[in-house]
Amino acid sequence: LYACNERIMSDRDELIVGVLNLAKASDAVLLAGNLIDNAKAQAEADVEVKAAAAEADFRRINGLGPKDRIPPKLRGAYNAIAKKDELKRQATRLTRDVLDRALNSVASIYRDVAVLQNNAEDAVGLINLENRSSIAELSVRLDRAAAVRRLEDIATARRRLNGNGNPTLVFEALFCALIP
């Protein structure tokens, strides 16, 4: 997914750097806001692309061109494709997926910290190689218990998100907990 979508990769890189640069609660709140906004925008864009593709498929299957009027007999089925309620539900689901992916990205930072703390880089390598120096600094500042505690904080955030917690509050709380 990251390899084929430049924006998703850019958002991930921005998130990783943002987490590594957390220094105060205001940083955490701003980072959470940016993450939520990016997740919603990404989800809405994906839903629009899928809806447009579904409409094009519907027209093609029914022998209609892009500019042809939809016959009255087919309007109900055509309108069901792009119902606002359904699109909103899909966008919400996709937003949750994007946020879950963000949690995986944040967890990868602390996985890399643990790898460096345990001198296992040669054996398993780092996920976030482009941020190696910042992760190395973080691995020195945190003890092993603190790194594990942050992974537990990420798991707690995931449970809260899966339990329909407010995404903004979940990520603000998480990012505040991650401040070294």
Model region roles, listed by residue range:
Residues 1-105, 115-180:
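Charged, glycine-rich active-site and insertion segments that engage polyanionic ligands
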